A protein has these predicted regions:
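Extracytoplasmic ligand/sensor domains, especially the bilobed periplasmic-binding protein
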Residues: 99-215, 266-292
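Short, polar/charged alpha-helical segment
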Residues: 41-63, 201-209
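Short, low-complexity disordered leader/linker segments with a strong preference
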Residues: 1-29, 94, 419-426
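Immediate post-signal peptide segment of exported/extracytoplasmic ligand-binding proteins
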Residues: 20-32, 62-71, 175-184
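Segments of small-molecule ligand-sensing domains
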Residues: 312-324, 335-402, 426
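Beta-alpha junction/loop-to-helix N-cap segments that form part of ligand/metal-binding clefts
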Residues: 22-25, 40-46, 61-140, 152, ...
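Extracellular/periplasmic periplasmic-binding protein-like sensory domains
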Residues: 132, 136, 154, 258-328, ...
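Extracytoplasmic "Venus flytrap"
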Residues: 31-49, 75-83, 106-109, 189-198, ...
Length: 426
């Protein structure tokens, strides 16, 4: 009996010694939330994943005298179809999965609901997809509650509309110079939600001031699968340009049918689906000449970090990142704030996030007093991209520097669809 006890004691001692020096690595849990079955959520995840891999490989995040590895938690929000599902997903991420930080989101209504959950729990939440201005104005209206919210991407709806109007102006100038149509007719096609409604209001107010005529407004569901009726009506209205505001899956059937029918109107604006390489295959090549606002394009260099990131993303995932992959910069911004704070305490990290002055992949990222990302020359501007014969290329800001003297290497000329030229050329 004594012999058995000695053996057991020795076995325990061996196990104890074997365990020495193998302290479990400390981790920081970051929840990445979005519609994971769609490119928006996929790119939220891919962007964060790439940053986390780079940071962990380089040693992790230094917090005081401790070093932490990043642990990402993928959270499917299903927000394109259900705000309630999105809210529940955010709550599970925080209360069940135990994430310390949250980033992602795409649909403004859903992000607003998720924002409330994060604020209830004093969890820092980085917006990486929703553009509604109201998400950030809450910060100044009730700072103590909403100070944990920051938007990294995209720029807000006001600036999005401004960039969209620059793309519209570019197409209109081509129509004026090449086709001799001095007052182009514009059809507004925007999905029916907060984002779409905001864009419609802005477009109705701005387009006439740009020397163009609005011939109608069409607002399909963001999840529409057939836009034949809308496109037929737009053609019947005699539109020369379709100004789009599409963040949801409807962007694929829209562009495919536009190209198939060869609707004689240039398509410009925002079509998130067209920001992804899979768009070409998904539309069977019929999305050729579609133009959309984006953040990234092959061979376009906004900062010294842009091309290395895009190239790495393509090498890893096989596609060009959409703006939702701004989670990549977000993880690095969070790392910097945590290390400057020397703490994981949310209030301490917020103080450092407010000081952010970070040259990232889309430009210099600085937050204003509403915790919104600053837009304009010297900061984040976004770019215009167009599908040209199977390649997604950058076309705005123009290569001649005519927009506020901003020039990015790799920009090429915008092209009108040949069927538009054939229809309207005198």
């Amino acid at each position: 009996m004594i012999k058995g006890a000695i053996v057991l004691l020795l076995a325990c001692l061996v196990l104890t010694v074997a365990g020495c020096g193998k302290e479990e690595a400390k981790t920081i849990k970051i929840g990445v939330i979005g519609p994971m079955s769609y490119i928006m959520g996929e790119h939220h995840w891919f962007g964060a994943q790439l940053a986390a891999e780079e940071i962990n490989k380089a040693g992790g995040i230094k917090v005081g005298n401790d070093t932490y590895q990043i642990e990402l938690v993928q959270v499917d929000s299903n927000e394109l179809f259900s705000v309630t599902d999105a809210q529940s997903a955010a709550e599970r991420a925080i209360t069940v999965e135990g994430v310390s930080f949250l980033m992602g989101g795409i649909r403004s209504e859903a992000v607003a609901a998720m924002q409330e959950i994060a604020m209830d729990n004093k969890v820092i939440f980085f917006g990486c997809g929703a553009s509604d201005v109201a998400l950030c104005t809450k910060v100044t209206q009730n700072y103590e509650r909403y100070k944990y919210w920051f938007r990294v991407t995209p720029v807000n709806g006001t600036y999005l509309a401004g960039v969209g109007f620059q793309l519209l102006h570019m197409a209109a100038q081509e129509i004026r110079s090449e086709l001799g149509i001095m007052q182009p007719k514009v059809a507004i096609l925007a999905e029916k939600n907060v984002f779409g409604d905001t864009m419609v209001a802005a477009a109705n107010a701005q387009i006439p001031k740009m020397g163009m005529t609005v011939v109608g407004v069409w607002q399909p569901s963001p999840n529409a699968t057939d836009l034949t009726a809308e496109l037929s009506a737009i053609e019947a209205a005699g539109a020369h340009i379709i100004f789009t505001a599409l963040s949801g899956p409807a962007g694929i059937p829209y562009a495919a049918k536009w190209g198939e029918l060869q609707v004689p109107a240039a398509s410009v604006g925002i079509n998130v689906q067209a920001q992804d390489d899979g768009f070409w295959t998904a539309t069977g090549g019929k999305g050729n000449y579609e133009m959309t606002m984006n953040i990234y394009a092959r061979d376009v260099e906004i900062t010294t970090k842009t091309k290395p990131f895009v190239d790495a993303f393509i090498a890893e995932k096989g596609v060009v990142p959409t703006y939702n992959a701004g989670t990549y910069d977000t993880v690095y911004i969070l790392k910097g704030a945590i290390e400057r704070a020397g703490s994981l305490d949310s209030d301490a990290v917020v103080v450092e996030l407010e000081k952010t002055d970070y040259v990232g992949t889309p430009g210099k990222i600085v937050f204003d007093q509403t915790h919104d990302v600053k837009w304009g020359p010297g900061f984040v501007t976004a770019i215009g991209v167009q599908w040209q014969d199977g390649k997604l290329v950058g076309v705005w800001p123009p290569a001649d520097g005519s927009w506020k003297t901003v020039v990015y290497k790799g920009i090429v000329d915008y092209k009108l669809p040949p069927w538009v030229i054939a229809k309207w050329k005198p």
